[in-house]
Amino acid sequence: FFKA
């Protein structure tokens, strides 16, 4: 999971 990641938020750019």
From Swiss-Prot:
Domain of life: Eukaryota
An individual GO BP term: neuropeptide signaling pathway
Transmembrane residue ranges: none
Keywords: Amidation, Neuropeptide, Secreted
Record's GO cellular component terms: extracellular region
Secreted is among the record's keywords: yes
Subcellular location: Secreted
Secreted keyword on record: yes
3-phenyllactic acid PTM sites in chain numbering: 1
Modified residues (Alanine amide): 4
Tissue and organ distribution: Neuron specific.
Primary localisation category: secreted
Described purpose of this protein according to its UniProt entry: Inhibits spontaneous contractions in several muscle groups. May be involved in the expansion phase of feeding behavior in sea anemones.
Protein name: Antho-KAamide
Source organism of the structure: Anthopleura elegantissima
